[in-house]
Amino acid sequence: MSYAETTNPNAPVSMVSTWDKTFAESDKVDHRKVSFQNRYGITLVGDLYLPKNRGDRKLAAIAVSGPFGAVKEQSSGLYAQTLAENGFVTLAFDPSYTGESGGQPRNVAAPDINTEDFSAAVDFLGLQKEVDRNRIGILGICGWGGMALNAASMDTRVKAVATSVMYDMSRAMGHGVGDGKDRYSTSDRRAVLQYLNAQRWKDAENGTFAHGGHDIYVDENGKVTAAERILPETLPDNPNPVLKEFFDYYRMPRGFHARSVNSTGAWTATTPLSFMNMPLLSYAGEITIPTLIVTGEKAHSRYFAEDAFKAVGSKQKELVIVPGANHVDLYDNAAGKIPFGQFEQFFKTNLK
């Protein structure tokens, strides 16, 4: 759908009332479907989770989002519901342009707007009668880990920040995801920019936005290619182990959701442009609040977490490396490796 085809491009796409998550509904929490606006006027849709035994006291709250290209019915909802079982008011939300949230065209990401989405979630939580607005934290999973740290460096209302198997999406798109290090050379970056800006001409001429994979490859001859989808419809023979990790979650019943970009399609093809020139962690050194960065021992993304940990300025920071865990092990608890107890203790200690 193009921007011109809707009378209210910022309105929610839907607000499904039935339980349609990839995880079981807990009998220990109350659940509400909610909506709220960010400062760009885009209406975000979220799931609010509240402990059933909360009484009348005001509670600490946590906004949760991610992974990049996922929806609140997947990993972020599981984290939010589990933390709510342990006494927090939590909000898992769909970022702008994705899931049930508003914004046209669909399947767009941008570092500024997505950082703002976290602050808008703080706005919403701070207005709820069950919440003590002086005790709000945020948690970002995968690519939303970088967004969470960016928000924490700017939004002084956030009192604690945590990440799980984080990606720095500016670095990932701007320098390529390699084997524990950046993949692009300077000439590779220039070739990717040429490729993306050629796509802008095509989009302008066609009056529509093409979609394609955001992980763009440059071969030894300088040829640039990108997949049509984030994940293939079927897994190839002898797949890359990281591709198989993602496929086994997003494309299989374990984690598939029809509204998830990662499960069913791709971002707009030009989505990497703003990430390439707007580093998310430029001000990580100004983060002064308690910070917890969790990653997996075998996660291909581990280097993002370790480098972000070094960059964070807080004196109260902790890096947790989960033994034996790969990246997607911390999306759901299929392998029993998500350290929910450490997330719970971190927020209980620092949101009191």
Please tell me what each predicted stretch does.
Residues 11-57:
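N-terminal cap/lid segment of alpha/beta-hydrolase-fold proteins
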Residues 57-67:
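Short beta-strand element of the alpha/beta-hydrolase
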Residues 69-81, 95, 305:
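The serine-hydrolase catalytic nucleophile loop
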Residues 82-102:
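Conserved alpha/beta-hydrolase
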Residues 108-129:
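Alpha/beta-hydrolase active-site loop
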Residues 150-247:
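Alpha/beta-hydrolase-fold enzymes
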Residues 287, 293-295:
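Short beta-strand/loop motif that positions the catalytic acidic residue
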Residues 325-336:
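Catalytic histidine-centered segment of alpha/beta-hydrolase-like enzymes
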